Regions:
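Active-site neighborhood of HAD-like aspartate-dependent phosphohydrolases
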Residues: 1-52
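Metal-dependent phosphoesterase signature
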Residues: 18-35, 60-69, 83-86, 102-110
Length: 181
């Protein structure tokens, strides 16, 4: 079978990039968008770019919440994005944390950012061209993961996500897709 052509995508951190985080967030009643997140997701969706979330969820490894809690929260997030005109194609997470009481959860892994394992996994699953893709997150570890995966990476200052999304679109995607300029 022929290989699917690879396409660019947007990779986003979850906590304090898309949604507000006041610690380990897993309860739906605490769900709140970051300023500009809804508009940014809509902007990416209208441009035909798949959006992926890559998130460290060390609260699982530390026993603060369960994988099931996180999946329920993520399903709510995906539904909320769709209801507001955006879309999230897939979410990849790392449950590990160096301070976990469980040695298996505390061991070094390839998925906890700044390691790029989650990015590579999603790229393989969805035929994504990482070299043409962008990573956005609020921590240096997000930017480092993106760079290690060969992507352009942006540090989000927790201001208005759509302002950064517009810059990313103008810099990386509009010039390539709009021949009228």
């Amino acid at each position: 079978h022929a290989l699917m052509p690879q396409k660019p995508a947007i990779f986003l951190d979850r906590d304090n990039t898309l949604i507000r985080d006041d610690g380990y967030i897993f309860k739906i009643e605490k769900f709140a968008w970051i300023t500009g997140a809804v508009a940014a997701l809509k902007r990416f969706h209208q441009a035909g770019l798949p959006v992926f979330i890559v998130t460290n969820q060390g609260g699982i490894g530390r026993g603060i919440f369960t994988e099931s809690d996180m999946h329920n929260f993520n399903h709510y997030l995906i539904d909320a994005a769709e209801k507001t005109g955006g879309a999230i194609t897939d979410i990849a997470f790392c449950p590990h944390h160096p301070l976990s009481p469980d040695p298996a959860m505390a061991a070094a892994c390839s998925c906890r950012k700044p390691e790029p394992g989650l990015l590579f996994d999603l790229a393989q699953k969805w035929q994504i061209d990482l070299g043409a893709s962008v990573m956005i997150g609020d921590r240096d570890s997000d930017v480092e993961a993106g760079k290690r995966a060969g992507m352009a990476a942006y540090l989000f200052d927790r201001g208005d996500l759509d302002q950064l999304a517009k810059q990313v679109m103008d810099r990386h995607f509009m010039a390539k897709t709009d021949g009228r300029k």
